[in-house]
A protein has these predicted regions:
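A sequence-level/structural motif corresponding to short, flexible coil/turn segments enriched
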Residues: 21-269
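Bacterial Sec-dependent N-terminal signal peptides
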Residues: 1-24
Length: 269
């Protein structure tokens, strides 16, 4: 077993102990193997990068697995019960592997109100532009075929903003009251990075009634802390929250070329 899976899943175990035993800082010995879980997915290099918990107390861990660059990566999701055991009624004995693209980075996993599972990240084929993606699974780990194409929804920034020739990196997403998905990140260009925002409907279709045909790439008209107009600014959205009034709160970092302090935080609604 490779060390990467040991380190990533050990971190998962430490999060578990902090939830249950924050007051003592001791391992929960009744969880996994004396408080630690080690899972080898397919004798491969595995990277756990997102974690959440469902309403029954089951823990879901998401990330990527690969046997080598030529074969590419796959999304994995593993589900554990509150004792740290793989849930055999989820996926294939507690684990699922799903091919999405050659290169994948998982950013977040979260639960829908109805028990469905959302996984978001960035994906691209070899020598192709990276795009946002959202994968939706049913509660048993099966891809939800009513969402996107066979459970997978992707952004189309490279088509709508072809002139930028950038990769689009997802940093966060959230779910609103109507199960719409709002996702934010940045285009990683050779020039100034810009905020990227997209909205998907509950069926995984880009909501063309939102902003500019469902998407936005650009820098917000932000003033710096001295209330001076920013001439050239680089904005990267790192967090989004869907508010109860139907609006979205987006936060991130901006770089300002004509400011005394180059880096500042921004929040827009």
């Amino acid at each position: 077993m490779r060390q990467s899976i040991r380190y990533t899943l050990l971190f998962f175990a430490l999060i578990k102990l902090q939830i249950n035993y924050a007051q003592t800082g001791k391992l929960a010995l009744n969880f996994g193997n004396n408080g630690v879980i080690i899972t080898d997915l397919q004798q491969s290099t595995d990277y756990a990068s997102a974690i959440t918990m469902d309403k029954s107390g089951n823990v879901l861990v998401a990330g990527t697995t690969e046997k080598g660059y030529d074969t590419g990566k796959q999304v994995f999701v593993a589900q554990y019960n509150n004792r740290g055991q793989l849930q055999t009624n989820f996926g294939n004995n507690g684990k699922i592997l799903i091919p999405v693209a050659h290169q994948i980075r998982i950013t977040k996993i979260m639960m829908q109100y109805d028990g469905k599972i959302l996984i978001g990240g960035t994906a691209n084929e070899k020598d192709k532009t990276a795009e946002f993606f959202i994968l939706r699974l049913l509660a048993d780990g099966t891809p939800d075929k009513t969402f996107g194409i066979n459970g997978l929804a992707k952004s189309k920034f490279a088509v709508a903003y072809a002139a930028t020739k950038s990769n689009y990196i997802l940093n966060d997403f959230d779910l609103d009251f109507y199960n719409n998905i709002i996702a934010v990140g940045a285009n990683n260009s050779s020039m100034l990075d810009q905020t990227a925002i997209i909205k998907f409907t509950p069926s995984g279709i880009i909501d063309e009634n939102f902003l500019f045909e469902g998407m936005y790439v650009g820098s917000f008209p932000i003033t710096n802390s001295n209330n001076k107009n920013v001439i050239n600014n680089s904005c990267t959205a790192t967090k989004v929250v869907a508010l109860s009034n139907g609006t979205y709160l987006v936060g991130g970092t901006q770089y300002m070329s004509n400011a005394n302090s180059a880096f500042e935080n921004f929040t827009v609604q």
